[in-house]
Design a protein with these regions (language model features):
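Extreme N-terminus of proteins, especially the signal/transit-peptide cleavage junction
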Residues: 1-2, 106
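N-terminal phosphate/diphosphate-binding loop that engages ATP/GTP or pyrophosphate donors
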Residues: 3, 17-89, 93, 98-102
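Hydrophobic anchor at the beta1->P-loop junction of P-loop NTPases
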Residues: 6-7
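Conserved glycine-rich cofactor-binding loop
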Residues: 10
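Conserved glycine(s) of the Walker
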Residues: 13-14
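Switch II (G3) loop of P-loop NTPases
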Residues: 95, 99-103, 107-122
Length: 122
């Protein structure tokens, strides 16, 4: 399986747009592809759930109900700050483990979208 990490210089620089386009491109080329957004901040609360627009866009592009996110944070700041504030020890090995879950392994290609900009320490 091949994986690509999608990052950018800042938040709102077009990572989700590019991820969505790549999912559509690879699907058109008959390549089984899944987009993942393991960590997201700036979420909206809906009852007991958090919703993140980027996660929703990628899930729609995936045409799948697989959970592509494991860490959602309400505050619109760098996820490592929010995680530390909440006592969550979010480490890169945890994110890598999430991206290697069995349900993602049947795909030929994983597109993993980062959170925030290039220098976010996750």
């Amino acid at each position: 399986m091949t994986s690509f990490f999608i990052t950018g210089t800042d938040t709102s620089c077009g990572k989700t747009y590019v991820t969505r386009l790549l999912i559509h491109y690879f699907r058109h080329k008959q390549i089984r592809c899944i987009g993942l957004k393991p960590v997201a901040s700036g979420c909206e609360r809906h009852g007991d759930d958090f919703i993140n627009e980027d996660v929703e866009i990628i899930m729609q592009a995936n045409q799948s109900n697989l959970a592509i996110n494991n860490w959602l944070f309400e505050q619109p700041v760098s996820p490592h700050f929010v995680a530390a504030d909440k006592g969550i020890n979010l480490q890169s090995k945890d994110i890598v483990s999430f991206c290697h879950r069995p349900e993602f392994m049947s795909y030929q290609l994983r597109l993993i979208e980062g959170a925030g900009g290039l220098m976010v320490p996750l």
